[in-house]
Amino acid sequence: MIITSLLDTDLYKFSMMQVVLHHFPAAQVEYRYKCRTPGVNLRPYLDEIRAEVHALCQLRFTEEELQYLGSLRFIKSDFVDFLGLFHLPERCISIGEGEQPGEIAITVAGPWLHTILFEIPVLAIVNEVYFRNTRRHPDWDEGRQRLQSKMHLVLDDPALADFRVAEYGTRRRFSKLWHEEIVSTMKAQMGAHFAGTSNVLLAMRHNVLPLGTMGHEYLQACQALGPRLRDSQVFALEVWAKEYRGDLGIALSDVYGMDAFLRDFDMYFCKLFDGARHDSGDPFVWGERLLEHYRNNRVDPRAKTLVFSDSLTFPRAIELARQFAGRCKVSFGIGTNLTNDLGHEPLQIVMKMVRCNGQPVAKVSDAPEKTMCDDPAYLAYLRQVFQLPPA
């Protein structure tokens, strides 16, 4: 089986899940899968995908896994107790044929607390099933050579002594074995340049730092859970701060675009949060705007961290590191370019929350193609409320 541990997912799923347990235990949500890569035929593999998801739903956390989660400073004991009883409910996931030729349809609907852990392993399953059928003889040597070239861009440049990169590629990895090789190789060869991984299982197994804070779904759900739509981003950040009391302090900035984020990210949040994460739009413009915003709020940017994670490559990350050197702390999360770069085109697949408590939710990011919503009227209303230009 592809997924053999419920820890084989990204850390931010657990940090969000703990907030859901403590603040929104009754929330009901719906997620929908989408493949953005044209011309991909996944239908021949439907039965394989269903079998893998069935096996996923039989998994439980082991005692060793629960102890590891409990050792993380921000994970509370009642959450670990809850996870000791947890399994993914198979009745909440539906897998079938999509509307377009070759397309598959995957939806997840049910309690947020019980369905939040579906997304990452399901995407990893779709990826691995597809590639093990279409790339039966992967060019491992090509992949290893590409990885070495990337690492040496950093290792061979003394000016990049402070460069830190994390592996963020669970959902779009070529395979779990290749994923593990990437993490073990980076740990062995990059030393302090390797900040860690978003994958909790690999962090535990290789004794590296698990990394992650919040994802888009958290801020999207707060559109339905907060007091009113206009205040939903502030509400989400305040609930996060109430839960973590200053820990896990990287705010996600692109659910409503940078303009709306800066309007809401006032002096209080500037001081309270450690920094922000970029995930769409021009990263250089975004970084400069954020630094200016900190200065305008009388906060020294040198004490803050800018995290870049949008479709990053090593050359792009190095360029960003040079631009912001000495002006703030920077960190980089590289996903697909690490875990699925063996010389073929990776799949652009996502699984996004589309409803919470019966109402539509959406991300209106700085990259229009990333917007995913099944209700155009709601999307138009969201743009109006957050003073965003029409699509």
UniProtKB/Swiss-Prot annotation:
SUPFAM superfamilies, A to Z: Nicotinate/Quinolinate PRTase C-terminal domain-like (SSF51690), Nicotinate/Quinolinate PRTase N-terminal domain-like (SSF54675)
One Pfam family of this chain: NAPRTase
EC number: 6.3.4.21
Chain positions found as Phosphohistidine: 216
UniProt GO molecular function: nicotinate phosphoribosyltransferase activity
Pathways involved: Cofactor biosynthesis; NAD(+) biosynthesis; nicotinate D-ribonucleotide from nicotinate: step 1/1
Keyword list, A-Z: Ligase, Phosphoprotein, Pyridine nucleotide biosynthesis
Domain of life from the UniProt record: Bacteria
Modification after translation: Transiently phosphorylated on a His residue during the reaction cycle. Phosphorylation strongly increases the affinity for substrates and increases the rate of nicotinate D-ribonucleotide production. Dephosphorylation regenerates the low-affinity form of the enzyme, leading to product release.
GO biological process terms on file: NAD biosynthetic process via the salvage pathway
Reactions listed under catalytic activity: nicotinate + 5-phospho-alpha-D-ribose 1-diphosphate + ATP + H2O = nicotinate beta-D-ribonucleotide + ADP + phosphate + diphosphate
GO cellular component, one term: cytosol
Function: Catalyzes the synthesis of beta-nicotinate D-ribonucleotide from nicotinate and 5-phospho-D-ribose 1-phosphate at the expense of ATP.
Family, similarity comment: Belongs to the NAPRTase family.
Protein name: Nicotinate phosphoribosyltransferase
Species assigned in the record: Bordetella petrii (strain ATCC BAA-461 / DSM 12804 / CCUG 43448)
